[in-house]
A protein has these predicted regions:
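Substrate-binding cleft of carbohydrate-active enzyme catalytic domains
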Residues: 1-127, 131
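Active-site beta-loop-alpha junctions enriched in small/polar residues
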Residues: 8-10, 61-65, 107-109, 136-138, ...
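Short low-complexity, flexible loop/linker segments enriched in glycine and/or proline
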Residues: 17-22, 71-78, 141-150, 177-182
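A glycine-rich phosphate-binding loop feature that marks nucleotide/adenosyl-phosphate handling sites
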Residues: 65-66, 103-107, 137-142, 244-248
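Short glycine/threonine-rich loop-to-helix capping motif typified by GTGT followed
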Residues: 111-119, 144-153
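Short catalytic/ligand-gating loop segments at beta-alpha or beta-beta junctions
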Residues: 133-138, 181-183
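Flexible, acidic glycine-rich loops studded with aromatic residues
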Residues: 144-146, 152-280
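Disordered, acidic Ser/Thr/Pro-rich linker "stalks" and the adjacent N-terminal cap
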Residues: 278-341
Length: 342
């Protein structure tokens, strides 16, 4: 089990720094000023994770997603001054986190200093840590990085470098009921089991939008049920296709795939009532929810038009010389078009 902790962003630097307290100053924080994790809290969480056999992976995103750093120091991370400061921060971070890995980001940024990433990887390794980096991001050859983390459909595992698959696993893009089906069905990186090149998967909860209560992240994004769905694949392997294949559609009731999901749902609801009792577990049974979905009728931009299904429900419709079918769908969340495609 893994907990990936993204500690720094454009909006704020959320990990306390004793050597550079200005990083946590409210004047350098543009969202939820004054809120950050102390070094003592970070150490306590490391101990908690160890007791529960959870690997904690802290992330200090560099050189992108670093506007908070720039506000505090008036230096870009890739500048000579920025690199000196960052190494001092890495000393503090590596001392605080008694864990084997450190994630250094490297995504969504223009590289202006070709020495920045190799030098930072070497520096973190000199502290006894293995290094993880986003892909797409800096391009590595085998031996130049310890693991990559795929964050986009463009992300590709490289032979000789273990990869973590998070390409389509963004909870903030999910419907609570629809996408759990895709997570459960999905092969990790379209592989039935792990290998030296495919290390596993991580479920991403990016709270890009401002919220008034942190617990709403858990509720609105269906964290716990989706976490169990992806754990089913991470622990057991299998799956029927990749996330963007069958997608969020529950298979027909008479198929083995449907029966397997129904069994998983039953087990998940047991955990809701027992393991997660008292926690916001946003899921109810959906394998008994059935819909009839009619092909789309063109309204030509006229929102007041009335169509045959509004007068009478049928299995097929003939309208203006065209035939419109009806198909059954099962589940509490139905997409007409998904964020990842049709």
């Amino acid at each position: 089990n893994v907990f990936h902790w993204h500690l720094t962003e454009n909006q704020a630097w959320r990990l306390e720094s004793k050597i550079f307290p200005m990083l946590n100053d409210s004047v350098n924080t543009i969202r939820m000023p004054g809120k950050y994790y102390t070094l003592e809290e970070a150490r306590d969480l490391v101990d908690f994770c160890k007791k529960h056999q959870v690997l904690l992976i802290p992330e200090i995103d560099m050189p992108g997603h670093s506007a908070a750093f720039v506000r505090a120091f008036r230096h870009d991370m890739q500048s000579p001054e920025g690199m000196k400061i960052l190494k001092l921060l890495l000393d503090e971070v590596c001392e605080t986190f008694d864990v084997p890995y450190l994630h250094i980001g490297t995504d969504e940024v223009e590289f202006t200093n070709p020495h920045f990433v190799p030098e930072m990887v070497a520096y973190v390794r000199s502290k006894g840590k293995k290094v993880i980096s986003w892909n797409p991001g800096w391009h590595y050859k085998p031996g130049e990085i310890d693991m990559t983390h795929l964050w986009s459909y463009r992300g590709k595992a490289q032979p000789g470098i273990p990869a973590i698959d998070s390409k389509f696993h963004y909870l903030n893009h999910f419907d609570v009921f629809g996408d759990i089906v895709a997570l459960y069905n999905s092969r990790i990186y379209d592989q039935a089991e792990g290998s030296e090149d495919i290390a596993g998967t991580i479920l991403a909860l990016w709270h890009d939008r401002l919220i008034d209560n942190e617990w709403n992240l858990v509720i609105e994004n269906g964290l716990y049920p989706n976490m169990l769905a992806i754990a089913e694949r991470a622990w057991r392997g299998g799956g029927t296709e990749y996330f963007d294949g069958l997608g969020t559609i529950l298979p027909p009731e008479d198929t083995e795939a449907f029966k397997e999901f129904a069994d998983f749902e039953k087990r998940m609801l047991w955990h809701k009532e027992h393991t997660f009792k008292g926690y916001p577990f946003a899921y109810v049974k959906q394998t008994n929810v059935k819909w009839n979905i009619t092909d789309a009728f063109p309204n030509g931009g006229d929102m007041d038009k009335v169509f045959p299904p509004e007068q009478e429900l049928k299995d097929i419709y003939h309208y203006n010389g065209n035939t419109y079918g009806v198909r059954q769908a099962i589940g509490a969340g139905i997409y007409l078009r998904h964020v990842w495609g049709d």
